[in-house]
Amino acid sequence: RWKIFKKIEKVGQNIRDGIVKAGPAVAVVGQAATI
């Protein structure tokens, strides 16, 4: 039971980490697209 919960927690952290890292890149791409 707890293994599944820990796996979900780890995946959630990875997704959050990816969003935090991708955020600035997405903003830069968005600015480049509007120019």
UniProtKB/Swiss-Prot annotation:
GO terms for cellular component: extracellular region. One of its GO terms (biological process) is antibacterial humoral response. The keyword Secreted applies. The modification Isoleucine amide is found at I35. Its main location: secreted. It is found in: Secreted. InterPro entries: Cecropin. The keyword Metal-binding does not apply. Pfam families: Cecropin. Keywords: Amidation, Antibiotic, Antimicrobial, Immunity, Innate immunity, Secreted. It comes from the Eukaryota. PROSITE patterns: CECROPIN. Belongs to the cecropin family. Cecropins have lytic and antibacterial activity against several Gram-positive and Gram-negative bacteria. This is Cecropin. It comes from Bombyx mori (Silk moth).
